[in-house]
């Protein structure tokens, strides 16, 4: 199998359940990072297709709920686990080792619940408006932008020693990966939203990435929870911004 195809399948297998997980070396995992936007395209396509075929047509509220459900199933809810964990750790105002203890605790607290409610609520509202407007292409663009933003976040933070996944993602976020992520995200937005909406979305996603990078540098490390929160936050931003544009 060609190396590039192995890395592409590795990225899709890691970020979705639609491709079987693959055995990989540390170098392979790092090389797969530049294929994260492709994994976003796979997620977006899987979420878009049922509705393009007419699932629950003329019932936008039901379509929006089904969209959230399908998105969760396709991604195994991987990114939302990061939202809950990071909300608990950040919301507690803890720093240092205590921050990481809370972040790695599998139990969910009040801040985690609030983070999930806000995140799911935003995703549902944004999707509902998208279904009303009929601009289903945004459903494809959102996951591409989210995973591209994750790559850029990894490029802004020193790898640290807190997490193997964080270290490998940071190692893979080289200039090529950044260029691919930025180009794919920009094209996805320009093809599905007005120019002003594209600018607004990029600005808000940039603020999310910057805030997460600042927190990661403050706490001297980054892990998969940061990545998941970045993906979920930027994906939701695309839906909400497009619904108002």
Curated annotation (Swiss-Prot):
It is a multi-pass membrane protein. It catalyses: alpha-ribazole + adenosylcob(III)inamide-GDP = adenosylcob(III)alamin + GMP + H(+); alpha-ribazole 5'-phosphate + adenosylcob(III)inamide-GDP = adenosylcob(III)alamin 5'-phosphate + GMP + H(+). One of its GO terms (molecular function) is adenosylcobinamide-GDP ribazoletransferase activity. Its cofactor is Mg(2+). It is found in: Cell inner membrane. Keywords: Cell inner membrane, Cell membrane, Cobalamin biosynthesis, Magnesium, Membrane, Transferase, Transmembrane, Transmembrane helix. The chain crosses the membrane at residues 35-55, 108-128, 137-157, 176-196, 197-217. It is an enzyme of class 2 (transferase). GO terms for cellular component: plasma membrane. Pathway: Cofactor biosynthesis; adenosylcobalamin biosynthesis; adenosylcobalamin from cob(II)yrinate a,c-diamide: step 7/7. One of its GO terms (biological process) is cobalamin biosynthetic process. Its EC number is 2.7.8.26. Joins adenosylcobinamide-GDP and alpha-ribazole to generate adenosylcobalamin (Ado-cobalamin). Also synthesizes adenosylcobalamin 5'-phosphate from adenosylcobinamide-GDP and alpha-ribazole 5'-phosphate. Belongs to the CobS family. PANTHER family: ADENOSYLCOBINAMIDE-GDP RIBAZOLETRANSFERASE (PTHR34148:SF1). This is Adenosylcobinamide-GDP ribazoletransferase. It comes from Nitratidesulfovibrio vulgaris (strain ATCC 29579 / DSM 644 / CCUG 34227 / NCIMB 8303 / VKM B-1760 / Hildenborough) (Desulfovibrio vulgaris). The gene is cobS.
């Amino acid at each position: 199998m060609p190396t590039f195809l192995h890395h592409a399948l590795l990225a899709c297998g890691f970020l979705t359940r639609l491709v079987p997980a693959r055995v990989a070396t540390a170098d392979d995992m790092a090389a797969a990072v530049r294929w994260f936007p492709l994994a976003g395209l796979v997620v977006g396509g899987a979420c878009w297709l049922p509705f393009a075929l007419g699932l629950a047509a003329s019932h936008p509220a039901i379509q929006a709920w089904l969209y959230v459900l399908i998105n969760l199933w396709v991604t195994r809810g991987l990114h939302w686990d990061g939202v809950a964990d990071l909300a608990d750790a950040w919301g507690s105002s803890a720093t240092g080792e205590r921050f990481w203890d809370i972040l790695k605790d599998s139990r969910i607290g009040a801040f985690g619940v609030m983070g999930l409610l806000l995140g799911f609520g935003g995703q549902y509202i944004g999707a509902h408006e998208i279904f009303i407007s009929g601009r289903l292409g945004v459903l494809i663009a959102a996951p591409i932008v989210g995973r591209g933003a994750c790559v850029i976040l990894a490029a802004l933070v020193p790898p640290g020693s807190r997490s193997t996944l964080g270290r490998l993602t940071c190692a893979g976020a080289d200039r090529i990966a950044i260029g691919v992520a930025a180009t794919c995200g920009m094209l996805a937005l320009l093809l599905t939203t007005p120019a002003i909406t594209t600018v607004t979305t990029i600005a808000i996603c940039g603020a999310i990435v910057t805030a997460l990078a600042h927190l990661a540098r403050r706490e001297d490390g980054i892990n998969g929870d940061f990545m998941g929160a970045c993906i979920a936050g930027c994906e939701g931003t695309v839906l909400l911004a497009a619904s108002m544009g």
